[in-house]
Every structure is written in C-alpha cells, then in structure tokens.
Amino acid sequence: MDLFYSNFDNDDKLITINQIDSKHIIRSFRKKIGDIIKITNGKGSVCEAEIIEEGKNIKVEIKRILNYKREKLSIHIAISPLKNISRFEWFVEKATELGINQITPIISEFTEKKKVNIERLERIIISSMKQSNQCYKPIINDVKDYLSFISNNNDEKIMANMKTDNKLDKGFIKSNNICLMIGPEGGFSDKEIIHALESNIKEITLGKNRLRTETAAIYSISAIKSLTN
C-alpha cells in the first residue's frame, strides 16, 4: 500500500491532508470515500485511515496506529553545498532512501555555494521518505559555518580526507551517533584539517579515486551501514 505523509499526533482522531497529497490520492491513486490509506508522521508512527471527506483537502479518520522503533545507529552527514544544486538535491533524495538521520549543510573555505533552499530540501526528503516506504523523516538543519559546526555538535565526528591513508573500518566507529563530514570538490583546507585533528576529529580516506561530493557522501553512508550491520 502506498504511503502518504502528515504531521499527525498519536492522539489525533482526524487528519486533514494537504492539497498536493489530496490531489494525488484522489486523481492518481483513484481513492474515494470509504477507502483506507496509510499515513506516516515521519516520527515512527504509521496510521491506517479511512477517507471520510473529499475536496481540495481530503479528511481521513484514523482507524489504527502502528509505532516502529528506529535503528540504534544514527548517521549525520555534514556536507558542503554544491554549486550544481541538482546534484545536492540528488544526494538529499538518495541519503533519505538509505535511512540517514540528519543532514547539515556546512560552509567551509572552498565551498562555492553559500545558501540552500531548506524548504525545498524538506519537500524532497518527504517525497523520498514516502517513496522508500519509511516512517522516520530525516532532519535537514540550517546551514552552519565549519567552525561553528565542529564546536557545537556532539556526535562522534569523522572527516573524509584524501590526504590520509586511514581506511574506514569498525575501529573508527565507537558510538551509535556518527557524524561524517564531507567537504566541497576541493576538499577541506589544510587549516580546517588541522583544526579538526586538534578537535579530536578522526580522518579517513574513501579510496584512491577522487569522488564527487555527493558520491562520497552516499558511499560513506552505505559503508557505515555495512560495517555496523
């Protein structure tokens, strides 16, 4: 059964669906009054709900709610925004499919694009979450500058750096809250790398090939999940 999204609470009885999803439900999926649909709130709950009113904003009545536990492993990607925004949006979409927990755009010395449209990325995340049939919505944080981020985030941090020979293995993963930092196409500056090492941030290589920023991020998510499963 297809999955839809609404930010409902578990004690709600009725849900009003937004206009875009209402249109898809009625026109694309040909649902009608009396039909049952599945809705997630992106916080681990999925409800089965009956359509009770059609219109621009359809209304549904919750019949049953199922709650799902999240994996213990939490992966947070701090990544430099890309000049080609479509490639960055592709990363956000695929990272959501892979079950990422958080994404933070970070501005480092060689970052070419300083701003991102958080609202648009939020819509991409919701769409990808529904498509991949997940009930937890990743958090997309506001843009942070490099120094502010590494000073205020408490996750175990690992930095991707082509200049090191350290390979990603289980020895680098000491907790269930991991933050992997991915720099822009030119990588992090020498000054940023030194600051990271002084802040006890580990550095790893992702191989001999020079990867695009978005490729490096997706590869890293997959590698971490493979090592911890």
Model-derived segments and their meaning:
Residues 75, 157-158, 176-182:
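Generic beta-sheet signal
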Residues 190-229:
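Structured adenosyl-cofactor binding patch, chiefly the S-adenosyl-L-methionine
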